[in-house]
Structure formats: C-alpha cells, structure tokens
C-alpha cells in the first residue's frame, strides 16, 4: 500500500485568492506562560486544499450538513482522456484544466467528485456551472503528478455546521 499526500501545507501569510483575507496562524498560548502551547488559525474555508459544495456558488445549493463522509471518499481515476470521467467515480485533473467542453461532459457523466491540481484554478463561471449541477469539486490538490491511473481518494471536510465548503486533508491510497 502506498499513500500520497495531496494537501498543501497551511502556513502564516500563505498566498490566497486575490481579495481574500490573509491566512494568520498565531501563538495564542505558550507553555512558559500557560502550561501548554496552542495556536489559533484564521483562514477562509477555501484556503489551501479544499472542497467546494453547491451552496458556495449557487443561491439555493446544498450545504455541508446535507452530505455524509462517504460522499468525499471513493475510487478515482487520474484524467488522461474523457473515458476517465465515469458516473460514481472521482476524477482528478493533474495536467489539464477544465474548460467548457469538459465541464459539459462532467455534468453529463456525473462523477462522484472532481479535483484540480494546484497548478490550475477554475474559471469562475465553469465552477458555478458545476456547482449548480451538484458536482463536488476539490481545488489546490498537491502532488497530483505522483498519482497512478487508479486509486482511492480521501478528501474529508471538517464537520462545520451549515458550511459552504471546507479545508481538507486530501490523500490517495493505492
């Protein structure tokens, strides 16, 4: 069994989407003063590796509470061609961004979820189109060039009430 970490490292003042608030990781308590160490983080739900769910880009989409953990885990394929987009399976895009033609194929074939390498960002209109069609998507996946053709993908969100997305610790097992 091999595991590949697909998550970006979160760190203080890391790059964020233009216009978003800065990531801040600060020392809230120290061992010397308080008897333990504790850091506090200030992040947007879309900083680093994260999952997008419909309410993020639609007026009446589903929020995180309406999903179960199984929705974020599944057998997946590394995208090489349109054949790799299959109903009920995940598909990860490492070497190609999603254009309108691919977005329409994705909606038609209904994969369990899709994911984009950190090399790419969704076109906002394409992202909204996919969210309107209830396609779960991951962004800023790291190390996608190390993925085999088939693998189990895990990208489980934090359990945040009524959330519109979440940071994830994503990884592949094969």
Residue ranges and their predicted role:
Residues 1-174:
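Active-/binding-site microenvironments in catalytic and ligand-binding cores
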């Amino acid at each position: 069994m091999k595991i590949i970490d697909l998550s970006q490292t979160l760190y203080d003042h890391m790059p964020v989407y233009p216009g978003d608030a800065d990531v801040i990781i600060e020392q809230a308590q120290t061992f010397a003063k308080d008897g333990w160490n504790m850091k506090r983080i200030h992040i947007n739900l879309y900083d680093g590796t994260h999952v997008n769910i419909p309410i993020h880009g639609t007026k009446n989409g589903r929020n995180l509470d309406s999903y179960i953990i199984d929705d974020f885990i599944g057998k997946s394929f590394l995208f090489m061609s349109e054949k790799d987009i299959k109903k009920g399976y995940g598909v990860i895009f490492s070497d190609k961004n999603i254009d309108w033609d691919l977005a329409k194929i994705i909606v038609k074939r209904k994969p369990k979820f899709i994911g984009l390498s950190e090399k790419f960002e969704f076109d906002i209109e394409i992202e909204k189109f996919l969210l309107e069609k209830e396609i779960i998507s991951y962004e800023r996946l790291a190390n996608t060039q190390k993925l085999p053709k088939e693998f189990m993908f895990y990208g489980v969100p934090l359990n945040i009430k009524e959330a519109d997305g979440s940071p994830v610790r994503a990884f592949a097992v094969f």
